[in-house]
Amino acid sequence: MDSFLKKVYIFSLIFILPVLINADNEVCFELEDNPYPNHPAFGVFSKYVNVLDCIEIYAESNISDEKILHIAAVAAELLDNDEDGNVDDPLIESSLIELNTVMPVFQSENGNAIETFFDNLDEDGCTGAVVFRNEIDPDQPGHWGDDATVEEVLHTINSCGHVEVYPALYALEPNASYLTDAMDVARGGQFITFPGTYPEDSWYHYDDWTCDYECMAMEYLYWCIVTNMDILSDAQTCAGIANEWEPCSPELFEATDTLMFNLVTDPANQLPQLAPDGNYCPSSADVKKKISPISFTVFPNYPNPFNPTTTLQYDLPEDG
């Protein structure tokens, strides 16, 4: 190859490579303006995405479009894990729609927007979690310590979907479900609050004093689902989470926590098996544009590795 052709070839690689990389991040959702700019709570947001009619994402103006669409893609992948354009579990879909499920995206936990939002959120609905700008990394979907999107979206779907639809499996109270019975085994006993130290044979030992029993159960469900997806098995992550969660690979999960492995992998339960990669654009997808009536209830905001001590508690009247 002569020098001219070499230069052309190298130039072509340099030019084409970014296009190929960008082409890998495909999200077939439309970013819109906030449909309720004058609402006392939702007026703090300027950006909006409707995800399969199930989750409505509201974001502050300084959150990049890329990050908002990343949340939308991850949410869609968790709801439609086979990416055929349809939510995998119709009952979960119905619950999320009926409860007007919302995911707020804030610049920071210290800003005025989050206080204004919750102070004025005065009607029924479902907010299972929030996410902050610095917790979102579209380049590392679900990677512990870098991208909390998978965790916070799972908390939202589980809180507003699974706990509501399948209480025998997922109710969060002590002695109430398969989930909490399994958690009592994983923690080495039934501890309503953090016991200070856990039995030596436990493998789930969450140590956040602000997290009550129900919060512990929600975190446990998250760990089980993402472990089965093989999101946590790299050496750095395993070491980083060992103080809280020991079986960091699917193989260890199967061998250690047989109760939850059986629940998570049972096809009848229709839990997501594949880790989101931040791409969602099924050829058969019908991306809907329904805007639900504003009506919300705040569910517990479960901690994440970025803000492990964040606690949001609001007393909201049932009717504004």
Predicted features by range, described:
Residues 161-237, 244:
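Post-HExxH zinc-binding segment in Zn-dependent metallohydrolases
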